[in-house]
Amino acid sequence: MRLVIAEKPSVAKSLAAVLGAATRKDGYLEGGGWLVSWCLGHLAGLADAATYNPDYAKWRYDDLPILPESWRFTIAKDKRDQFDVLRTLLRREDVTEVVNACDAGREGELIFRTVYCLAGCQKPMKRLWISSMEDSAIREGFANLRPGADYDGLHQAALCRAKADWLVGINATRLFSVLYHRTLNIGRVMSPTLALIVQREAEIDAFKPVPFYSVALDLPGFTAASARMDKKADAEQLKTACQGGTVTVKQVERRDKIREAARPL
């Protein structure tokens, strides 16, 4: 029996339909020599600081920085039942191989590996790596399963990202909140993004409009405009020179241009 673990129920159902696992069970599908189950996104995550030391429940400057020597994980309370299903399946004696069918990416790798490790599973692991949910793509993916070890680096990268988020979020949030006597959430991604917004707002506030002038000629079928000029007198001079004259089109050039959407701020 081979166990397939997808990242979400909808994906698991699509995989099961192709594999012939049509019998619905509690938290998984079975059939054709396959067990197909699913996570619900991240079933587990890095534990909060208070898990390491109850004293960390209170935010104090003297406790910083908080640097776990051995990282711990906790199961999300609202997802405990599905984790128990997966753990039971992973420990079944008739399951000889596990297929990681979570999303093809860094986070998908972390979602599966976390469950796999917390369940204490050491069974052979394969990786399904597909970018399409078409039946043909699924069949091809299962025909070309890769060794799970090929993606150890991806798992380590995802775990590094998660730990970096934890270290910055826990320590910086507590530091600034204690110093300024108010809750100030700091994040590895959130704070730089907020800084970009603040910087843009400052640019808008400092903007000073500068007048400019140009001369436009209304011609049959199109309008021809001059370059911008800083001085009105220069524009008036060009306007006077054009009045009563004859326009000759010497060259026509057509180009497709992509106009980017205006920035939200």
What are these regions (language model features)?
Residues 157, 182-184:
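Alpha-helical hydrophobic/aromatic positions enriched in membrane-embedded helices and signal peptides
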